Design a protein with these regions (language model features):
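Canonical Radical SAM [4Fe-4S] cluster-binding loop centered on the CxxxCxxC motif
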Residues: 1-11
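Short, conserved sequence motifs enriched in acidic/basic residues, glycine, and aromatics
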Residues: 6-8, 63, 165
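A short acidic, helix-capping loop that chelates divalent metal ions and anchors anionic groups
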Residues: 2-4, 88-94, 156-162
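Radical SAM/AdoMet-radical enzyme domain recognition
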Residues: 11-31, 39-152
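A C-terminal junction/extension of Radical SAM enzymes
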Residues: 153-192
Length: 192
C-alpha cells in the first residue's frame, strides 16, 4: 500500500507533543491511523529520546521484521497491537491476500525476541464468533499475544457497508463472551 505524507506529523512535531504531554503528566502515547510503522525509524527515535514514556502502535503487522524487533527490544518502551480479523481466509478477505501469513510471521518474531505484543480485532456480524472462539484465542496465545483489543465494526463514509454491523443479539453475545475470556476461573491467559 502507498501512504501519503500530507497528514503525517514531522518528528519534531511528535517530539513536541510528547514533551508537552509530559509537562501535563502524560507518559503513554498511541500511534493509530494509516500504518504507523511506515514511520518506524522516527518512532524508535522518539522512544529513545523519551525513555520515560511508553509508546504503543496499532499496526497491520506487515512491516515487522527482525531488525525492527531488535530495535524494539533495545529501546524497551514500545509495543504493538497487530490487526487480525480471523483465520487466514477471513483475515485476507478484509486485509489483503497473504496478510495473515505475514501477521503470523510477525508474531513469531515478536515471540522469538521476547517482546510484549497483542492483537487488535475488529469484530463484525460475520466474524464475531470466530475471533472469540477458543480455537482462535488459543492460536494467538500460542503465538505469544499477551493482550487483545476488541473493537466493533463501525461503518465510516458514504459507501461503508452496514451489513457488517452486529445486531442486538450479537452485541449481547460479545458482551458476555468477552467477560468469559477475562474471567479468572476458566478464562484465557490473555488480557481482553
Amino acid at each position: 500500500a502507498e501512504y501519503g505524507n500530507r497528514l503525517n506529523l514531522s518528528f519534531e512535531d511528535m517530539d513536541r507533543i510528547v514533551t508537552q504531554g509530559k509537562e501535563l503528566g502524560i507518559y503513554l502515547y498511541f500511534f493509530t491511523g494509516g500504518e504507523p510503522l511506515v514511520r518506524k525509524d522516527d518512532i524508535i527515535r522518539l522512544c529513545e529520546k523519551h525513555d520515560d514514556c511508553g509508546f504503543h502502535a496499532f499496526t497491520n503487522g506487515t512491516l515487522i521484521d527482525e531488525k525492527f524487533c531488535q530495535e524494539m527490544k533495545r529501546v524497551g518502551n514500545f509495543s504493538v497491537a497487530i490487526s487480525l480479523e480471523g483465520f487466514d481466509e477471513v483475515n485476507d478477505l478484509r486485509r489483503g491476500k497473504g496478510v495473515f501469513d505475514k501477521v503470523m510471521h510477525a508474531m513469531d518474531l515478536k515471540k522469538q525476541y521476547g517482546l510484549i505484543f497483542g492483537t487488535s480485532i475488529c469484530y463484525t456480524s460475520k466474524n464475531y464468533k470466530v475471533v472469540t472462539s477458543d480455537e482462535f484465542l488459543d492460536m494467538i496465545i500460542e503465538k505469544g499475544a499477551r493482550f487483545s483489543w476488541y473493537f466493533h465494526y463501525m461503518p465510516v463514509g458514504n459507501d461503508a457497508s452496514t451489513e457488517l454491523l452486529l445486531d442486538p443479539d450479537q452485541r449481547e453475545y460479545m458482551y458476555h463472551r468477552i467477560r468469559e475470556i477475562r474471567a479468572m476461573k476458566g478464562g484465557k491467559p490473555i488480557f481482553a
